[in-house]
Amino acid sequence: MNPIRKKRLYWILALLCGVSIAMALALSALQENINLFYTPSQIVAGEAPQGTRIRAGGMVENGSLMRTQDSLALRFSVTDGAHNITVRYQGILPDLFREGQGIVAMGKLDRNGSLIADEVLAKHDENYMPPEVIHALKQAGVLDNPKRVKQESTR
């Protein structure tokens, strides 16, 4: 084989190896960061995977918030109007967190169907609700006037 062709072949092979490694790393990073959204009805039906990080959203049930006296541990129920799930969280809740308001909690399901949350997100203002929560509440027939609720603008 001609030395120039051999050198060119080595460069092409090195380039292909580099691109392959970069693609593998990118796909691995994306796979770890995908958090699918599930409603309480989907979680109760068993559609959400256990042990995988998911997002669950709905309305915080009135009277369901229970705090422990000696730690930051708390639990509350989230509903979509049809079903509810228990969310357990250790930490400080967002300032806008209230019973009867929309939230999205991120975490993993335990064997009992409770969400062990490591992050809780509350709505932005008195009219904002995450788009996934609006869709879930519309399907459950709970949301009475969806036009008064602002959705996050997509930019």
Swiss-Prot record:
Belongs to the CcmE/CycJ family. The keyword Calcium does not apply. This is Cytochrome c-type biogenesis protein CcmE. Heme chaperone required for the biogenesis of c-type cytochromes. Transiently binds heme delivered by CcmC and transfers the heme to apo-cytochromes in a process facilitated by CcmF and CcmH. Residues 30-155 are periplasmic. It comes from Janthinobacterium sp. (strain Marseille) (Minibacterium massiliensis). GO terms for biological process: cytochrome complex assembly. Its main location: membrane. Keywords: Cell inner membrane, Cell membrane, Cytochrome c-type biogenesis, Heme, Iron, Membrane, Metal-binding, Signal-anchor, Transmembrane, Transmembrane helix. It is found in: Cell inner membrane. PANTHER family: CYTOCHROME C-TYPE BIOGENESIS PROTEIN CCME HOMOLOG, MITOCHONDRIAL (PTHR34128:SF2). One of its GO terms (cellular component) is plasma membrane. InterPro entries: CcmE, CcmE-like_sf, NA-bd_OB-fold. Heme binds at residues 124, 128. One of its GO terms (molecular function) is metal ion binding.
